[in-house]
């Protein structure tokens, strides 16, 4: 009986001690979107996604995606920068930057994609080309940048 009570008390104190380190913020799971329109009605949809971090820490991971869509909302292609950051309240630093792309539209092709990091920023650049009847119709190059503040806020 005493061992069970000690185990119960020990478990209670363990949970009590660890609870302040748990950081469950539902708003971190919701992406934030902005839109940039072109004259022909097509647009870039820009989405910021912050990865959930259940323990308070000085690291932050997230991604920023630019999706190019037609005037009717069809996704043509996208480029995403994935960034990892370290922050300490006075400064921030990007520790890793990677790029990923998608191209579901048959008339578009991603011809190049690269990523880089500098200071507290992670960047990715992609070039997409549209071919109609085998001929180049248009080219779009887009750079997306993910930044981290000294307090760990991604933008």
Each model region followed by its residue ranges:
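N-terminal prepro-regions of secreted/extracellular proteins
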Residues: 1-73
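Mature secreted bioactive peptide module from preproproteins
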Residues: 53-155
